[in-house]
Amino acid sequence: MSILDIHDVSVWYERDNVILEQVDLHLEKGAVYGLLGVNGAGKTTLINTLTGVNRNFSGRFTLCGIEAEAGMPQKTSDQLKTHRYFAADYPLLFTEITAKDYVSFVHSLYQKDFSEQQFASLAEAFHFSKYINRRISELSLGNRQKVVLMTGLLLRAPLFILDEPLVGLDVESIEVFYQKMREYCEAGGTILFSSHLLDVVQRFCDYAAILHNKQIQKVIPIGEETDLRREFFEVIGHE
């Protein structure tokens, strides 16, 4: 079952500077997709379009049956927001509230109940328990990233989008995140994250979508025998 369908999407910042051109991509429910591309390929631009940050686009995409296109009504935009959650590489958070209050606040925006018990359990897994009542302004970059990731894992939006999600995380936290990410997908969620780390995508993703020359050139199912490095450099033409 498809959770996200991107059809013929072109994106620009100025009309004479097209970043993406006629992009097509389909994400299935319950899978992890890695979005790969060299620096400047347009990974963040595509994510910003899917999350509503950038509205200079043509074509359309459909998320959970809700069709999005340029100039869509505010009601449609609001509906889309409740079906996705976005974690940026350098999160912008309300710094003068506590981590727990932030997670609770985001739940209220999504009109979902906040479970202190589930939050406490997840915080323990991330070795974050002693920070839950600290102001976000007092947290390191890595711990701020944990707040964003825990929020997404608890919300269970149908689509969880991440842009370089490992920034600031230690090795143990990365392993915890990927374990929880798998549980998220087993429960029916879909994850799309951009990365320039081939080894990370190879290990943790079900599919890799390679963005090059303004388009998704190839979507590769990842298995034990997949040589993602070879596949990637065959597409971009050099190593």
UniProtKB/Swiss-Prot annotation:
BP GO annotations: bacteriocin immunity; bacteriocin transport; protein transport
The keyword Cell inner membrane appears for this protein: no
Pfam families per UniProt: ABC_tran
List of residues binding ATP: G37, V38, N39, G40, A41, G42, K43, T44
Membrane-crossing segments per the record: none
Documented effect of changing A187E: In strain: ATCC 6633
Gene induction: Transcription is highly induced by oxygen limitation and is under dual and independent control of Spo0A-AbrB and ResDE.
Keywords of this entry: ATP-binding, Bacteriocin immunity, Bacteriocin transport, Nucleotide-binding, Protein transport, Transport
Keyword Ion transport found: no
GO molecular function terms attached to this record: ATP binding; ATP hydrolysis activity
Domain ABC transporter: 4-238
Effect of T82I: In strain: ATCC 6633
Function per UniProt: Involved in the production of the bacteriocin subtilosin. Required for immunity to subtilosin.
Alphabetized PANTHER family for the sequence: ABC TRANSPORTER ATP-BINDING PROTEIN ALBC-RELATED
Family statement: Belongs to the ABC transporter superfamily.
Protein's name in the database: Putative ABC transporter ATP-binding protein AlbC
Source organism (scientific name): Bacillus subtilis (strain 168)
UniProt lineage: Bacteria, Bacillati, Bacillota, Bacilli, Bacillales
